[in-house]
Curated annotation (Swiss-Prot):
Signal peptide: none annotated. SUPFAM superfamilies: HisI-like (SSF141734). It is an enzyme of class 3 (hydrolase). This is Phosphoribosyl-AMP cyclohydrolase. InterPro entries: PRA-CH, PRib_AMP_CycHydrolase_dom, PRib_AMP_CycHydrolase_sf. Mg(2+) binds at D78, D80, D82. GO terms for cellular component: cytoplasm. It comes from Cupriavidus taiwanensis (strain DSM 17343 / BCRC 17206 / CCUG 44338 / CIP 107171 / LMG 19424 / R1) (Ralstonia taiwanensis (strain LMG 19424)).
Amino acid sequence: MAKKWLNKVKWDDNGLVPVIVQEAGSNDVLMFAFMNRDALLRTVELGEAVFWSRSRKRLWHKGEESGHVQKVHEIRLDCDEDVVLLKVTQVDSIACHTGRHSCFFQKFDGDADTGDWQTVEPVLKDPAQIYTKP
């Protein structure tokens, strides 16, 4: 059966679309990733976020190693049809591989000459504990 809805997405030259992941309820931006057609289809089928890992060159089911899956509540396409927004519930409140709630834990503070990036979110769990394989 043809999945015509996938054709509405404007995939880039590599067959990818940028994805913003936002926490349902708080509206916190948790992370940014990419999807290909298969990842978006699997996300819809599973009800959990599946991305395309550009470094591993394979589908990446978020939480497959850590258990920190993202339950998808809503999928939106932006006005240009070239960015996807996932509204999710983040299992165990950890979205970032650094053990933080959000991947956006560094905030610029200061001016153009003396400013710097400050860490503004705590580590909720040591990544060594998250990714230790039994």
